[in-house]
Amino acid sequence: MIDLEQFSQSALDACTVDGALLAVPMSVTGRIFYWNTCTFEQAGIDAPKTYEELLTAGNTFREVLGEEYYPLAMDAAARMNLMVSYLESTTGKAWVVDRQLQYSADEIKTGLEFLQALEENHVMPTLAAQQTNGTLDQTPMWQNGQYAGTFAWDADAETYRSALKNASGFLVGDEIAFGGQANGGFSKVYLALASTAAASTRKKRRFWSTFC
Protein backbone atom coordinates (compact mmCIF):
# COMPACT_ATOMS: atom_id res chain seq x y z
CA MET A 1 0.00 0.00 0.00
CA ILE A 2 1.13 3.54 -0.74
CA ASP A 3 1.05 6.02 2.12
CA LEU A 4 -0.74 8.93 0.48
CA GLU A 5 -0.25 11.10 3.56
CA GLN A 6 3.31 11.81 2.41
CA PHE A 7 1.88 13.81 -0.52
CA SER A 8 0.19 17.20 -0.31
CA GLN A 9 -3.53 17.19 -0.97
CA SER A 10 -3.19 19.82 -3.69
CA ALA A 11 -0.70 17.61 -5.58
CA LEU A 12 -2.98 14.60 -5.22
CA ASP A 13 -5.92 16.65 -6.45
CA ALA A 14 -3.95 17.54 -9.58
CA CYS A 15 -3.68 13.82 -10.37
CA THR A 16 -7.34 13.09 -9.65
CA VAL A 17 -9.98 12.92 -12.39
CA ASP A 18 -13.67 12.30 -11.67
CA GLY A 19 -12.83 11.24 -8.12
CA ALA A 20 -10.20 8.67 -9.12
CA LEU A 21 -6.50 9.08 -8.33
CA LEU A 22 -4.80 8.22 -11.63
CA ALA A 23 -1.17 8.83 -10.66
CA VAL A 24 1.08 9.67 -7.73
CA PRO A 25 2.78 13.09 -7.89
CA MET A 26 6.56 12.89 -7.46
CA SER A 27 7.50 16.53 -8.01
CA VAL A 28 5.81 19.90 -8.49
CA THR A 29 7.13 22.94 -10.35
CA GLY A 30 6.04 26.57 -10.28
CA ARG A 31 6.61 29.74 -12.27
CA ILE A 32 9.17 32.14 -10.79
CA PHE A 33 11.20 35.13 -11.93
CA TYR A 34 14.77 34.77 -13.15
CA TRP A 35 16.96 37.84 -13.60
CA ASN A 36 20.27 38.58 -15.30
CA THR A 37 21.75 40.99 -12.78
CA CYS A 38 24.65 41.82 -15.11
CA THR A 39 22.25 43.72 -17.35
CA PHE A 40 20.52 45.39 -14.41
CA GLU A 41 23.93 46.59 -13.20
CA GLN A 42 24.56 48.10 -16.63
CA ALA A 43 21.28 49.98 -16.24
CA GLY A 44 22.31 51.13 -12.76
CA ILE A 45 19.44 49.47 -10.89
CA ASP A 46 18.73 46.33 -8.87
CA ALA A 47 16.50 43.49 -10.01
CA PRO A 48 12.89 44.39 -9.16
CA LYS A 49 11.17 43.12 -6.03
CA THR A 50 7.88 45.03 -6.40
CA TYR A 51 5.47 45.79 -9.22
CA GLU A 52 6.40 49.47 -9.05
CA GLU A 53 10.11 48.64 -9.38
CA LEU A 54 9.30 46.39 -12.35
CA LEU A 55 7.53 49.22 -14.18
CA THR A 56 10.34 51.64 -13.37
CA ALA A 57 12.92 49.14 -14.64
CA GLY A 58 11.30 49.07 -18.06
CA ASN A 59 11.63 52.80 -18.58
CA THR A 60 15.16 52.83 -17.14
CA PHE A 61 16.25 50.10 -19.55
CA ARG A 62 14.89 52.09 -22.48
CA GLU A 63 16.55 55.33 -21.38
CA VAL A 64 19.93 53.90 -20.32
CA LEU A 65 20.46 50.81 -22.48
CA GLY A 66 18.25 51.43 -25.50
CA GLU A 67 15.10 50.17 -27.16
CA GLU A 68 16.43 46.62 -27.66
CA TYR A 69 16.86 45.94 -23.92
CA TYR A 70 14.00 44.70 -21.73
CA PRO A 71 13.79 43.58 -18.09
CA LEU A 72 11.46 40.72 -19.08
CA ALA A 73 10.63 38.48 -22.00
CA MET A 74 8.41 35.41 -22.13
CA ASP A 75 6.26 33.33 -24.45
CA ALA A 76 2.47 33.38 -24.68
CA ALA A 77 1.95 30.58 -22.14
CA ALA A 78 4.11 32.32 -19.54
CA ARG A 79 2.23 35.59 -20.13
CA MET A 80 -1.04 33.82 -19.47
CA ASN A 81 0.40 32.33 -16.26
CA LEU A 82 1.65 35.75 -15.16
CA MET A 83 -1.77 37.26 -15.81
CA VAL A 84 -3.37 34.53 -13.69
CA SER A 85 -0.90 35.26 -10.88
CA TYR A 86 -1.84 38.93 -11.11
CA LEU A 87 -5.57 38.21 -11.01
CA GLU A 88 -5.24 35.78 -8.12
CA SER A 89 -3.24 38.40 -6.20
CA THR A 90 -5.68 41.23 -6.84
CA THR A 91 -8.99 39.35 -6.57
CA GLY A 92 -8.17 36.59 -4.08
CA LYS A 93 -9.89 34.09 -6.38
CA ALA A 94 -8.46 31.03 -8.09
CA TRP A 95 -8.47 30.90 -11.90
CA VAL A 96 -10.55 27.70 -12.09
CA VAL A 97 -12.47 25.75 -9.44
CA ASP A 98 -14.16 22.45 -10.29
CA ARG A 99 -13.48 23.13 -13.98
CA GLN A 100 -15.34 26.43 -13.81
CA LEU A 101 -13.74 29.78 -14.65
CA GLN A 102 -13.96 32.09 -11.63
CA TYR A 103 -13.36 35.46 -13.31
CA SER A 104 -15.78 37.79 -15.03
CA ALA A 105 -15.13 39.29 -18.44
CA ASP A 106 -14.24 42.60 -16.77
CA GLU A 107 -11.70 40.90 -14.50
CA ILE A 108 -10.06 39.16 -17.44
CA LYS A 109 -10.00 42.53 -19.24
CA THR A 110 -8.14 43.92 -16.22
CA GLY A 111 -5.64 41.08 -16.50
CA LEU A 112 -5.04 41.82 -20.18
CA GLU A 113 -4.59 45.50 -19.35
CA PHE A 114 -1.93 44.45 -16.84
CA LEU A 115 0.01 42.72 -19.63
CA GLN A 116 -0.51 45.73 -21.88
CA ALA A 117 0.91 48.00 -19.17
CA LEU A 118 4.06 45.87 -19.06
CA GLU A 119 4.47 46.31 -22.80
CA GLU A 120 3.71 50.04 -22.78
CA ASN A 121 6.23 50.64 -19.99
CA HIS A 122 8.94 48.75 -21.89
CA VAL A 123 9.05 45.97 -19.30
CA MET A 124 8.67 43.31 -21.99
CA PRO A 125 8.39 43.33 -25.78
CA THR A 126 5.17 42.47 -27.54
CA LEU A 127 4.93 38.93 -28.84
CA ALA A 128 5.08 40.30 -32.37
CA ALA A 129 8.32 42.17 -31.63
CA GLN A 130 9.89 39.44 -29.53
CA GLN A 131 12.43 37.64 -31.64
CA THR A 132 12.13 33.98 -30.71
CA ASN A 133 12.94 31.08 -32.97
CA GLY A 134 12.49 28.27 -30.49
CA THR A 135 12.51 28.68 -26.73
CA LEU A 136 13.63 31.93 -25.12
CA ASP A 137 16.88 30.47 -23.77
CA GLN A 138 17.97 29.69 -27.34
CA THR A 139 17.72 33.29 -28.53
CA PRO A 140 20.71 35.67 -28.73
CA MET A 141 18.67 38.28 -26.84
CA TRP A 142 18.52 36.06 -23.75
CA GLN A 143 22.04 34.75 -24.13
CA ASN A 144 23.66 38.19 -24.39
CA GLY A 145 21.46 39.85 -21.76
CA GLN A 146 19.23 42.06 -23.89
CA TYR A 147 16.29 40.21 -22.36
CA ALA A 148 17.29 40.45 -18.70
CA GLY A 149 14.59 38.34 -17.10
CA THR A 150 11.87 35.81 -17.61
CA PHE A 151 9.00 34.07 -15.80
CA ALA A 152 9.62 30.34 -16.07
CA TRP A 153 9.29 27.01 -14.28
CA ASP A 154 11.72 26.49 -11.41
CA ALA A 155 12.58 23.12 -12.96
CA ASP A 156 14.12 25.03 -15.89
CA ALA A 157 16.57 27.11 -13.84
CA GLU A 158 19.69 25.40 -15.20
CA THR A 159 18.41 25.67 -18.77
CA TYR A 160 18.22 29.45 -18.54
CA ARG A 161 21.39 29.86 -16.46
CA SER A 162 23.60 27.74 -18.71
CA ALA A 163 22.40 29.57 -21.84
CA LEU A 164 23.84 32.89 -20.67
CA LYS A 165 27.19 34.02 -22.04
CA ASN A 166 27.88 35.43 -18.56
CA ALA A 167 26.05 33.23 -16.08
CA SER A 168 27.57 34.89 -13.01
CA GLY A 169 24.64 37.29 -12.81
CA PHE A 170 21.88 34.68 -12.94
CA LEU A 171 19.50 35.27 -10.05
CA VAL A 172 16.35 33.53 -8.85
CA GLY A 173 14.12 36.49 -8.14
CA ASP A 174 11.87 37.32 -5.24
CA GLU A 175 8.13 36.87 -5.47
CA ILE A 176 6.50 40.04 -6.73
CA ALA A 177 3.23 40.80 -4.96
CA PHE A 178 0.75 42.37 -7.35
CA GLY A 179 -2.07 42.85 -4.85
CA GLY A 180 -3.07 42.40 -1.25
CA GLN A 181 -5.82 39.81 -1.65
CA ALA A 182 -3.60 36.72 -2.02
CA ASN A 183 -0.19 35.50 -3.08
CA GLY A 184 -1.01 34.51 -6.63
CA GLY A 185 1.03 31.78 -8.22
CA PHE A 186 1.04 29.07 -10.83
CA SER A 187 2.26 25.52 -10.27
CA LYS A 188 1.77 22.10 -11.81
CA VAL A 189 2.76 18.48 -11.27
CA TYR A 190 6.12 18.07 -13.01
CA LEU A 191 6.48 14.30 -12.66
CA ALA A 192 3.86 11.69 -11.75
CA LEU A 193 4.03 7.91 -11.65
CA ALA A 194 1.28 5.49 -12.59
CA SER A 195 0.89 1.83 -13.45
CA THR A 196 -1.53 0.50 -16.03
CA ALA A 197 -4.51 -1.64 -15.20
CA ALA A 198 -3.07 -4.36 -17.43
CA ALA A 199 0.10 -4.74 -15.34
CA SER A 200 0.28 -7.82 -13.12
CA THR A 201 -0.06 -7.43 -9.36
CA ARG A 202 3.55 -8.57 -8.92
CA LYS A 203 4.86 -5.95 -11.36
CA LYS A 204 2.78 -3.25 -9.69
CA ARG A 205 4.16 -4.15 -6.27
CA ARG A 206 7.73 -4.08 -7.56
CA PHE A 207 7.15 -0.76 -9.32
CA TRP A 208 5.61 1.02 -6.36
CA SER A 209 8.03 -0.43 -3.81
CA THR A 210 10.90 0.88 -5.95
CA PHE A 211 9.66 4.45 -6.35
CA CYS A 212 7.47 5.02 -3.31
Where do the language-model regions lie?
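Extracytoplasmic "Venus flytrap"/periplasmic binding protein-like
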Residues: 1-7, 38-49, 139-149, 159, ...
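Hinge/lid segment of periplasmic solute-binding proteins
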Residues: 1-30, 107, 172-178, 194
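Short, solvent-exposed loop/beta-turn-alpha elements that line the ligand-binding surface or hinge
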Residues: 2-7, 72, 92-112, 162-184
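Bilobed periplasmic-binding protein-like "clamshell/Venus-flytrap" ligand-binding domains
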Residues: 22-23, 63-76, 122
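Extracytoplasmic/periplasmic substrate-recognition and gating elements
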Residues: 42, 121, 163-212
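Short helix-initiation/N-cap motifs at beta->coil->alpha
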Residues: 51-55, 128-143
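Glycine-centered hinge/linker elements that transmit conformational signals in sensory
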Residues: 58, 100-129
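Short beta-strand and adjacent tight-turn residues that come in two discontinuous sequence segments
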Residues: 151-153
